[in-house]
A protein has these predicted regions:
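Carbohydrate transferase catalytic cores enriched for Leloir-type hexosyltransferases
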Residues: 1-833
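Low-complexity, acidic Ser/Thr/Pro/Gly-rich terminal tails and inter-domain linkers that flank the onset
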Residues: 828-862, 876
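Short, acidic/polar linear motifs in exposed loop/turn regions
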Residues: 874-879, 885, 936, 952
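Short beta-strand and strand-turn-strand segments in soluble, beta-rich domains
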Residues: 892-894, 898-916
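Intrinsically disordered, low-complexity Pro/Gly/Ser/Thr-rich segments with frequent PxxP/GP/PP motifs
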Residues: 907-937
Length: 974
């Protein structure tokens, strides 16, 4: 039997309340039913973030082709704007969507969604082909309409929908109480009680949870749930006030749940007005399932004092945990609780107080609760719920012999559109989008937008060109087609020529429509296009496609001192966008993958994330015709080579410091630097060109062709790679290809890529002394023999064809390196919820432990007269720090400074902060820039104290002191 279920209640505020929990477990039970069930669920694309979150949760027990989206047209709630034409159109679009899926039976899981949100539940109508049933929970708002339906539009909306319940072929009730409510209020309704259960996830956690509450002299009475009027929480302070003084003093009341603060304040005010101890009222926020179980187990009593409940899940869960429950004798609660000593009149604080006192005074209810627990476990199970539902639905289902013709379905819905005299504006598109995609061919779309747009030849674009070129030669991997794409505006993605030579002609092709069998791979650098791409990537996720982002490095986050000032915030925004839309990340090294994983942990990222990496290719085919053998005539002393763009991150100053000290102490060695002039390289270039050894033992080649590079590698005895941070390390791989030893800074990625070099020595990153020691050891050994031995064996590293195959192995064949899983088990987290990215309060002194170190040789004088240097900030605490705080500017963590004149007088303390870009995790080190503006130098600034500061809170102490007259290099301002 093919069953379709309206899943919009998993997108609205219901998703985190009783209805959402019920429907999710109901769907899981149906999907896992032993019956011949083919279950399908549809979500409303108008609530995009919520649809993606629900889609992710449903994948726990449904396949992608069982989860669908349709596009509603309503933008407001019915109780706010009425039953508008947009809602009528949405009903038509949803009807057409269901007809296209052709289930044997359709089920509306929650009929009262869309009061204050865009949800449009499916109701019976003339165009709908399959029989339609609904789940009926209760009619509490109607029973207490003076409380819940005060406005005429709210009452009209509720009554319109309640009256329509008589047109459903069957109502599935969740308790005997709700079944009787339906019979009483809905004339001619046909219903059955399918009951409810405790989630398997909850039971699994309970069975594995070893937590045992500690013996505590204080007792605890706990309420878990919402605070609206019918929950009757206001009776609890009144009952507490009637307890004996000893119990009042020895008992805490714990309020748990995601509560609006004004409602909590009302409870607190009532508590205080009754003279109850303020310290006895404790508030807990939204709790996870594991936390919930521990709350149940640690409580002496769980309260459920509602005026009316359609079921009583809190009471059921607490009793399954063996905890006494005191519940009102109203609604469906007596069906669950079943012990008279634990039931009370919800209008009597005195009776509630007596029940509390009876249990806290030592009433032995354990035998009764143990017996009831066994009984409840048998009665209320989701397996039984699924069996009951399947039996009830099978009675009214109509089996579809074959899928209907799509054209006939379009004609059918067109009749209803005409009869309803609907304006067709926007409706045609909504109806078209309502039709499920039928093409199940697997496709991998590779974004190359930036490379096509700019035609630059940066490192990233070299990767994009090589990967796209190799993909174009394959065209297909297994059953997956490989397609290069381009997107630069709101129209979406288009197929691009694999040569990447020009933009696609949008007038001769249609934009790509993504489906559940597709994967979108964001290979190119899309930092400047993140906002443009985000909308289309969300649409791809809505339709079930995978979105994989490529991460080259985290340099702008971890070492902003080595970037243009505008780059870190742009990169941060891109990464946030990528984290919102991606189902996975592929990194260009294992080291970067590990850094990403640690970042997700540090911000408590609340979603699952696949993380993989692949090795970039090293293409030596263009060197085949060149002489790659070692030169026969070698220098009488060691020759060292650096290859890479001139920029502060590459560590050229460290290398020059080491050689300066070495040359001064008798080290006889040459240093050749190969690299074009890069960002922030003015001081480095000036230092090289004015160096006394320049042209003698120090050489700089800013541009070389392939043949010259080969000659330089062959003439060298070792490569030096001194970077502070990298995403890869191509020169190390190249050195391995030419068989020369490597001396590298000890960073994880260099450890990783040194597999591509036969012999690598490491020195302490950023330490010229450590580098000099390593150079001396190299020179003191038989360096000629060592270099010769290294050249004999050339380690294997993938070429670009093999690299492309590795990449496909990760994305298509799903050979992921690791999967990040959040610690919290909260469901339905919005994709835009990225965890913790800011401080909302001051960091406690215990969380402020840190170390500051000025990077040697980093002091520079800018051309405009300002001064700049780099500070290494190490988090020595157990708490993650964030550069962002509240919107009013408070609580972000940054480097600040105080300036003093030559006499030690304070000149200035309110200065430009150098912020942590995103998050600085415990044990990690970030390199932050500090800039002193020219005007303060002109006013006599002679020294500086650099210190961590949390804005609006405190300076953290242990400042670094630095004299501004120290050696410096002149840097031009771009």
């Amino acid at each position: 039997m093919k069953i379709w279920v309206d899943g919009q209640c998993l997108q609205t505020s219901s998703r985190n309340r009783g209805i959402g929990r019920y429907v999710f477990e109901f769907l899981r039970a149906l999907a896992q039913s032993k019956s011949d069930i083919d279950l399908h669920v549809s979500l409303n694309a108008v609530m995009a973030d919520e649809a993606i979150a629900a889609h992710h949760e449903l994948l726990a027990f449904l396949s992608k082709d069982q989860i669908h989206v349709w596009h509603g047209m309503a933008s407001t709630g019915e109780a706010e704007a009425g039953y508008t034409e947009a809602r009528v159109k949405s009903q038509m679009a949803l009807t057409h969507h269901v007809n296209c899926l052709a289930p044997d039976i359709a089920l509306c899981a929650s009929t009262f969604e869309g009061f204050f949100d865009p949800a449009v539940p499916l109701f019976p109508n003339a165009a709908l082909m399959p029989p339609l049933a609904a789940i009926f929970y209760d009619a509490i708002p109607y029973r207490y309409k003076e409380r819940y339906l005060r406005r005429k539009l709210e009452l009209d909306t509720y009554e319109r929908r309640l009256n329509q319940h008589s047109t459903f072929e069957k109502l599935l009730s969740i308790s005997d109480f709700s079944l009787n409510e339906a019979k009483e209020l809905i004339q001619g309704s046909r219903g059955t009680n399918i009951s409810a259960g405790v989630s398997l996830h909850f039971l699994d956690l309970l069975s594995t949870d070893a937590y045992e509450p500690s013996e505590d002299s204080r007792k605890s009475v706990v309420y878990i749930g919402a605070l609206d009027w019918r929950k009757n929480v206001e009776i609890i302070p009144k009952a507490f006030a009637l307890l004996s003084k000893q119990l009042r003093d020895d008992t805490d009341f714990i309020l748990a749940g995601d509560h609006p603060q004004p409602l909590v304040d009302e409870i607190s005010a009532a508590w205080a007005d009754l003279g109850l101890p303020p310290s006895s009222l404790k508030q807990r926020g939204l709790v996870s399932d594991r936390e919930l179980i521990r709350l149940y187990k640690s409580a002496d009593i769980i309260l459920q004092p509602s005026h009316m409940e359609g079921f009583g899940l809190t009471a059921l869960e607490a009793l399954i945990c063996g905890t006494p429950v005191i519940a009102s004798n109203a609604g469906a609660l007596p069906e669950v609780v079943q012990i008279d000593e634990m039931l009370f009149d919800p209008n009597s604080p005195k009776e509630l107080a007596e029940r509390i006192e009876h249990i806290l005074a030592g009433a032995n209810l354990k035998p009764k609760i143990a017996h009831l627990r066994d009984k409840l476990s048998q009665t209320f199970s989701w397996e039984k719920v699924a069996d009951n539902a399947v039996q009830a639905l099978r009675e009214i289902a109509r089996e579809q012999a074959e899928l209907p013709d799509i054209q006939s379905l379009r004609e059918r819905i067109a009749v209803q559109v005409k009869q309803n005299r609907l304006d067709t504006e926007g409706l045609a598109e909504a109806l078209a989008l309502a039709e499920p995609l039928t093409d199940d061919k697997k496709r991998l779309f590779i974004d190359a937008t930036s490379t096509i747009q700019t035609q630059y030849r940066t490192g990233i674009q070299r990767v994009v060109r090589q990967i796209c070129s190799n993909f174009s030669e394959q065209n297909i991997h297994g059953e997956t087609s490989l397609i290069t794409t381009y997107s630069d505006d709101s129209e979406g993605w288009y197929r691009a020529d694999t040569s990447l030579a020009s933009k696609p002609d949008k007038t001769t092709s249609d934009p790509i429509i993504f489906g559940p069998s597709d994967t979108v791979f964001m290979l190119d650098s899309s930092w400047d296009s993140a906002k443009v791409h985000k909308r289309h990537l969300i649409e791809a996720r809505l339709r079930g496609a995978e979105v994989i982002s490529c991460l080259y490095d985290l340099v702008p986050l971890k070492t902003p001192a080595f970037c243009d000032a505008g780059m870190p915030p742009v990169f941060r925004d891109w990464l946030i966008s990528a984290l919102e839309v991606s189902t996975g990340f592929v990194c260009i090294s294992k080291a970067v993958a590990d850094e990403l994983y640690e970042l997700l942990k540090s911000i408590q990222y609340p979603h699952s994330m696949k993380i993989g990496y692949w090795r970039l290719g090293a293409d030596f085919s263009h060197l085949n015709d060149l002489d790659t053998s070692a030169s026969q005539e070698r220098n009488p002393h060691p020759s060292f080579l650096m290859v890479g763009t001139l920029e502060p991150r590459k560590g050229h100053n460290i290398v020059l410091d080491a050689f300066d000290a070495g040359w001064a102490s008798g080290l006889d060695a040459d240093l050749t630097i190969v690299g074009k002039f890069g960002w922030g390289a003015d001081a480095i270039a000036e230092r090289i060109k004015t160096h006394p050894e320049f042209g003698n033992r120090l050489h700089w080649r800013s541009t070389v062709d392939d043949a010259e590079l080969v000659e330089l590698y062959n003439a060298s005895d070792a490569l030096i790679a001194a970077s502070y941070a990298e995403g890869f390390g191509l020169p190390i791989v190249e050195a391995g290809r030419f068989g020369i030893p490597v001396i590298a800074s000890d960073i994880p990625v260099f450890r990783e890529v040194s597999a591509g070099a036969a012999h690598t020595r490491f020195f302490n990153t950023g330490s010229s002394d450590s580098l000099l020691d390593t150079l001396r050891l190299f020179c003191e050994e038989d360096w000629e023999e060592a270099a010769l031995e290294t050249r004999v064996s050339q380690p294997i590293w993938p070429n670009w064809s093999e690299s492309a195959e590795e990449l496909l192995g990760v994305i298509v064949d799903q050979t992921w390196y690791k999967s990040y899983e959040p610690e919290s088990d909260h469901r339905f987290r919005s994709p835009s919820d990225l965890g913790c990215l800011h401080h909302a309060q001051p960091v406690a002194p215990s969380g402020q432990a840190h170390k500051l170190l000025i990077l040697p040789g980093s002091m520079s004088k800018l051309e405009d007269g300002s001064k700049k240097f780099t500070v290494a900030v190490t988090n020595k605490s157990e708490e993650t720090w964030f550069g962002q705080g509240l919107n009013d500017g408070r609580f972000g963590v940054a480097l600040g400074y105080r300036l003093y004149d030559a006499g030690g007088n304070l000149l200035f303390s309110e200065n430009l902060r150098s912020r942590i870009v995103m998050a600085l995790a415990p044990g990690d080190t970030h390199l932050l820039p500090v800039t002193i503006e020219k005007n303060w130098i002109e006013e006599g600034a002679a020294s500086i104290e650099v210190e961590l500061v949390q804005d609006g809170a405190a300076w953290w102490g242990s400042p670094l002191e630095l004299q501004l007259g120290m050696a410096e290099h002149i840097v031009r301002v771009a």
